[in-house]
Amino acid sequence: MQVTQTLNEGLKRGYTITLTGAELDAKVTEKLIEVQPEVEIKGFRKGKVPMAMLRKNFGDRVLGDVLNESVDGAIKDLLDQSGDRPALQPKVEMENGKDWKPGTDAIFTVSYEALPPIPAFDRATVTLERLVVKADEASVTEALENLAKSAQAFEDRKKGTKAKDGDQVVIDFEGFLGDEPFEGGKGEEYPLVLGSNSFIPGFEDQLVGAKAGEDVEVKVTFPAEYGAAHLAGKEATFKCHVHAVKAPKPAEIDDELAKKFGAADLEALKGQVASRLEAEYKGASRAILKRALLDILDAQVKFDLPPSLVEAEAGQIAHQLWHEENPDHHGHDHGAVEPTEEHKTLAERRVRLGLLLAELGRNEKIEVTDAEMTQAVLAAARQYPGHEREFFEFVKGNAQMQQQIRAPLYEEKVIDFIVAGAAVTEKEVSKEELQKAIEALDEL
């Protein structure tokens, strides 16, 4: 075997691997000798099949195995010797594949992009600010009022009172396209809160001012993107009968409300609300801190990036954004989506930070434990109520899905490691200031 380097330019590497016909033949013979004692062919006793017969029956298959093993072994050796870590799976091609015949030399070309050397990074040089928001009494009261509103009841208004925004009207309705009723357009004694936007745009507005006992004809146009194709973009008339007009009555903020939400009493509910608010504030604060840290890393640590990784990431970004802009197109049967310069710039940032965090985690021997993975999978499974076990088994047998779950866990652990060694100061702010800081993240 002869291995010759043909390219060493930046991060690009190229090699030629030559396997002589003689060494391939010798390895085939060696493998056939190994299996000969176990081979049994009609007309020959077990272990007594002649080598010529073995070659005739199994030679091509064994030769294929020898070629694969030899090339894989050569690549492993050259990577061990060079210290290279390929950014993607090395590309292997048989140079004389179409014309190659057993017994002659087999020549393979191997090409890949190596991961770049990552500069050392000292987390102690990082200065960060953590925003702190306390769940004060006003915030807890506001949250309790929202809970009370969500638990509100409705009481009949005085007979003859006109319905207004926020009221609940109890209606029968039937929808028509022209003079023909359409399937799924009928309901009886349906409680509809005006202003909730739970019906087709314009429907609820036309019931404002209605009184109990009245018949109201509502005319609407279904949105062009409406889910039912036979209704999308069509004008329709709904004949409605109003049974009742009811006024909202917020629940009292008391022990009874607390029990509705699983708390022993009002004081216990206040404690739960305060804890939930503080958890939300901490989550938002961490997102801001993490963005600041990643900005620092992106600005301070520079190194060459494998073009193949940047190209793949830019393509993924462009594809994802295209689908976000075209939500009704769920398949991949669309034309090519070309990445823009903005996509490429974002891809460079993601690749740089991904490689940097991965290298730091590798050097510090940071790992995601089995227990952490199990918790993450269980959390993801809750998105599929009633099918948690099936989801768990699916993940268990799918390495790609496991990596999708493990990757963000790993990143967060590396971020935690950096923050733990950085100079972090705390700044107390209001929840409004925290909200503005969160909104600013989306603008960047």
UniProtKB/Swiss-Prot annotation:
Record note on domains: Consists of 3 domains; the N-terminus binds the ribosome, the middle domain has PPIase activity, while the C-terminus has intrinsic chaperone activity on its own.
Write down what this protein is called.
Trigger factor
Q: Name a biological process GO annotation.
A: protein unfolding
Broad class of the protein's primary localization: cytoplasm
Give the InterPro entries listed for this entry: PPIase_dom_sf, PPIase_FKBP_dom, Trig_fac, Trigger_fac_C, Trigger_fac_C_sf, Trigger_fac_ribosome-bd_bac, Trigger_fac_ribosome-bd_sf, Trigger_fact/SurA_dom_sf
The source's superkingdom equals: Bacteria
Asked if Cytoplasm is a keyword of the record, the answer is: yes
Domain PPIase FKBP-type: start-end pairs: 166-251
Coiled coil: which residue ranges?
none
Q: Please explain the role this protein plays, according to its UniProt record.
A: Involved in protein export. Acts as a chaperone by maintaining the newly synthesized protein in an open conformation. Functions as a peptidyl-prolyl cis-trans isomerase.
| Subcellular localization, as worded in the UniProt entry | Cytoplasm
The organism named in the record is: Rhodobacter capsulatus (strain ATCC BAA-309 / NBRC 16581 / SB1003)
What's in the keyword line of the UniProt record?
Answer: Cell cycle, Cell division, Chaperone, Cytoplasm, Isomerase, Rotamase
State the family it belongs to: Belongs to the FKBP-type PPIase family. Tig subfamily.
Keyword Cytoplasm carried by entry: yes
What is the catalytic activity of this protein? [protein]-peptidylproline (omega=180) = [protein]-peptidylproline (omega=0)
- State its Enzyme Commission number(s): 5.2.1.8
A GO molecular function term, named singly, is:
ribosome binding
Q: Name one Pfam family in it.
A: FKBP_C
A GO cellular component annotated for this chain's UniProt record is: cytoplasm
